[in-house]
Amino acid sequence: MTPSDASGGAPSGAAAGRWSSLDRPPLNAAALERALVGDGGLWSSVEVVAATGSTNTDLAARAGQLPEGAVLVAEEQTAGRGRLDRSWVAPARSGLFFSVLLKPGDSVPQERWGWLTLLAGVAAATGVSRAAGVDTALKWPNDLLITVEGEERKTGGILAEPVSYT
């Protein structure tokens, strides 16, 4: 992920070659669906797209038509958003970009919704640490960090936002 400049591209001075040799194979949508969607599970559907502006924006626009637990995954994000509406871009296959639709309704009081970012961050940090065997940390309020060569680097972020839908 790189912060975008005013033109929406990579920041000035960013090394273009840094992102030019990403060799991760494309995501296997069918395998993700088999692994994540099942009776009694948390996720109702998984959709993988090659590119999008923002998975959050796309999922929010369709929230009224989708069931709770819908997951949208993108190989590339061109208009990612973070806290305080900060924008960033992420070239194809440079990371994992996804959004999950939750519909807590009356089962979770609204005053508790603010905990979602922290809870998701703890879960993500634990998952990355266990799966990759790396030290992870959370930087308040929503950044996921890993240690690389003695330096903490941002490896992800959590953005939870309420959406009105009918």
Located regions from the model:
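Conserved small/polar residues in nucleotide/adenosyl-binding loops
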Residues: 166
